[in-house]
Amino acid sequence: MLSFFYILGQVSLPFVRVPIGGSNIDSRVSVFWIQDTRTGKSVAFEIVQRVCRDIGIEAVDYSTGTDAALVGSFVQENSDEPPVQRPGVLAGRKCMNFDEGSILLKPNQHSEGTVLFLQTALNAAGTGRNVLTKHLRDGTINIKSEVSLWITTFPPKGIREHVLDKGIFQRVLPIGS
């Protein structure tokens, strides 16, 4: 059932906005699934990927990477021409799987940057607050992100502190065993 609403949120995203006060929320559903290892968490996203492929929605896996992988970078394709912007995996409308979401819970410099990008990516579509900006030597990258996240992990130590302190949990639907 969760998979259905996850996919439906992406399908209806261009058409649905729910007014709340002076703003709105969109139809995306993002999931943070915490369950013991080797219990089949990844299998659910495999089914989601197949359905998404069949209906024309991109579904990608992500385990780790750089800011450039998430937001994008400038690439020099020809030395005679200026660098060209290459968007990162958070650009556009898609379903995105973090198979080991524990990387988002480890307090290190890299994961903190990743969490900030994901928080921005999950801001309500249509408000302009879901645009990620990265200032680089060759210019500034601005991408609009309309991803739905499917994050899975085992129950890490200190999960209560993360739930209470990290903004990523305010933007996803937590599922636990």
Residue map of PLM features:
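Phosphate-handling catalytic cores of nucleic-acid transaction enzymes
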Residues: M1-S177
